[in-house]
Amino acid sequence: KLAGICSYLFFAILLYFLFLGGETGYIIETGFQSLGNLVQNFIGLSTYMDPLRENGFAQNWTVYYWAYWLVWCVATPFFIALISKGRTIRNVVFGSFGWGLAGTYLSFIILGNYGLAQQMKHGVDAIGFIGNGGEMYEAILMIFDTLPLPWLALLLLTITMIAFYSTTLDG
């Protein structure tokens, strides 16, 4: 029950950014272009290791990703088992992979491209702010402040985060 509410809250946040943020066309067009780039360059992107250590992205991202999943690997199987009662193993595997991938892509496309639009088109220099020693969380708030009723978006995000954690840890 709470998992279903989480899904609605998550999509409400995405729709808030997509339709109320004023960058709908940019988000959709850039999203399709990025999916095309992913399909076109998938092999190269998935095997990129930065052997000359020119930028360290591959190594830093791997460390971050592994640390992230080490934190969640304990709770995730219980959560998936809790929401998968009565389903076949095939449905659980494909559902977890498919819906997880779709949710991740949607959130990266909508939230990422909204922030990119603010950086590129509207002068919200979040990248420069972080590069000059600013806190990442403050940069996120700078982007939220460009939305109509930013306090409502933050409240919706906070409620969604609490619901997601509650659902995951309840399993």
Show which residues each predicted segment covers:
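Short amphipathic alpha-helical segments
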Residues: 139, 157-158, 171
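Helix-loop-helix module between adjacent transmembrane segments
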Residues: 1, 24, 159-169
